[in-house]
C-alpha cells in the first residue's frame, strides 16, 4: 500500500525554459478542460493543491507539485505536472498553436518524465482531441516511459454504458477511435474519485500503486 507522506505546490512555468529543474521522477497529467485533472491530482496527493479555473481553457501554465510517497518501505520523491487543459481554450488560433508547440516541446525534451496520465471523460471516449493526444503520446513515448489512460467520471455512466466501457477497456484491450494502444507502454483504467469499492473501477489505493509501478518501470520490464 502506498502512503502519501507530504505534498506541496512547487511552481508554475509557461514553457521548458522556466520550468523547475528536475530532481525526481515526473508524472504528467494531460486531458481536456473539465475532465477532472485537478480533482484527480488533489485526490492522489491527499491535499487540495491543484486549482481549477471557472473559465475552461483559461490557464496556460504548467503547474508542478512535489510529493513524497512510501511504497514497500521505499521512500519515493515524485513530481506531478499538471498541463493546461486542452480543447476549450478561449484564445486566438495563433496563440493556441504557439501554446501547443511549447507543450509538445516540453513533453519531448523533459527527460525526467516517466509516466503520462492521459485523462479521458468516460462519457465521451471517442473525441477527436483525445485521439490526437493518444497518437501524439504513442509517437513521443520513449523506452523508459509509459502511458496510463484513465477514464474519469465513470460513476456518471449508467450500468449499461459502464459495462460496455469496462468490456472495451479490459477485455478488448481498448482502442481509442482506431488508435491501437495495446502495447507494453500503455494501460487503461476506469476510475472515479467518488465511487468506492466498485468492482468495475480501480480504487484509489490501486491507482496509486499502478502509478508507482509504471513510474519505476516495473509494469513493462524497464
Swiss-Prot record:
NCBIfam families: GTPase_YsxC. It holds the Pfam family MMR_HSR1. Belongs to the TRAFAC class TrmE-Era-EngA-EngB-Septin-like GTPase superfamily. EngB GTPase family. GO terms for biological process: division septum assembly. Keywords: Cell cycle, Cell division, GTP-binding, Magnesium, Metal-binding, Nucleotide-binding, Septation. Necessary for normal cell division and for the maintenance of normal septation. Residues 23-217 form the EngB-type G domain. Its cofactor is Mg(2+). One of its GO terms (cellular component) is cytosol. InterPro entries: G_ENGB_dom, GTP-bd, GTP-bd_ribosome_bio_YsxC, P-loop_NTPase. SUPFAM superfamilies: P-loop containing nucleoside triphosphate hydrolases. GTP binds at residues 31-38, 57-61, 82-85, 152-155, 191-193. This is Probable GTP-binding protein EngB. Mg(2+) binds at residues 38, 59. One of its GO terms (molecular function) is metal ion binding.
